[in-house]
Amino acid sequence: MTEVKTKRQSASLDRRKLLADPIMVTTIVVLIAFLTLFILYPLAILLVDSFYSKNGLTLGIFKRVLAMANFRTSIANTLKVGFLVGILSTLLGLLFAYVEVYVKLGKFSGGLFKVVSMLPVVSPPFVLSLSMIMLFGKAGLITRFLLKIYDNNVYGFWGIAIVQTLTFFPVCYMMLKGLLKNIDPSLEEAARDMGASRWKVFATVTFPLMLPGLGNAFLVTFIESIADFANPMIIGGSYDTLATTIYLQITGAYDKEGAAAMAVVLLSITLLMFAVQKYYLE
């Protein structure tokens, strides 16, 4: 009882010290104002537009949206791309992380490897899509002028999947690199001393220890993929995802309420993935 009371007094003292610091108070106020203005307020408007009509609170907007064939198709398209990109990005990120941690690279080659690994992160989100079109499109530098292929179509499902994988795998790479570095090397050394090959050590020791991290990496890239707008808009062609469907619902159909309802569906999928990550993987 005394220990609990002491902790409460200590926490109260810390709060008073915090509130006595004008710089810290100003920082907190600015952060709260920023979150309210740019996150909470738009989210509130989104919910109001999707649940309220002239007749008051209603689910009619969602019923109307769910009845749209293009919306149901875009949900299926988004989930298919998201799962594939999540799997491919996780595998590619694992490969890059494994090479950096376990393979001894030279100073120059190691530096070049890190630059190549992180290049998609520092590039604008649409650069890889444009590069794919310019290099492998019907008039692409590689397909048309080097390989003499004149009918190559980079648009659609596979175009989105490839570009998003190249865009988001560095996120998995950074997550898994830190995870591999934190694995106790004595566990792997013990397996090697017992005669296990490098592959068997990875399969029986390293990989099981990485499973929660792999799950986190998959969910993060899955969320990034389904929320991505720039790449599907540029290289998606007629393959619509939720993000592009929401955009076209506003700009093409001038249906603000319908777009808001679609955005709530997308937000719900994202929050569900965050919940899975929070309660099952952490």
Segments predicted by a language model, with ranges:
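Short, Lys/Arg-rich, polar N-terminal cytosolic tail immediately upstream
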Residues: 1-20
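Membrane-water interface segments at the C-terminal ends of transmembrane alpha-helices
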Residues: 21-55, 67-181, 209-229, 259-278
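Glycine-rich helix-loop "coupling/hinge" segments at transmembrane-helix boundaries
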Residues: 54-55, 134, 228-253
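A short amphipathic helical element positioned immediately N-terminal to and/or at the very start
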Residues: 14-15, 57-66
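Glycine/proline-centered hinge or cleavage motifs at structural transition points of membrane proteins
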Residues: 194-195, 208
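Alpha-helical transmembrane segments of integral membrane proteins
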Residues: 13-15, 276-282
